[in-house]
Amino acid sequence: TISLFLAQKAKQVYGVEIVPPAIDDARENAQLNGIENAQFFVGKSEEILPKYYKDYEEQHGGEKAHADVIVVDPPRKGCDAKLLDTILKMQPERIVYVSCDSATLARDLKILCEGAQEDEKTAGYQIEKWRAVDQFPMTTHVETVCLMSRVEGK
């Protein structure tokens, strides 16, 4: 549902989900709503995005894949290191991180804020806004949404 909402404002949207029926539903909803600028992939983000990045570079003569905005909504374990590394390489202007676990959110935000350590030209990110959302009242669970923007000239 995040991808379909974003498709209303974006030139192109790619959605990745590990649950095949969720992708089937997304494709059906896109078709029902006349959304043609969204593509969906079944698999783990930490496998799909690095492969997309590598394939894009090979198919475009070394040109790096780029995204204006990347939205992640990982499971409680947070984002895999390969996924975070690829996001940093793609250098989107903004990252929206939706989290259901504050500990893994803090861990991943630290990595994104520091940027890639081996490449000093790769910028890190700063948190612009964040909001805690109590989607599950009367429980200990809270969702957190963070908007991050790229810091130039690390």
Where are these regions (language model features)?
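Rossmann-like S-adenosyl-L-methionine
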Residues: 1-154
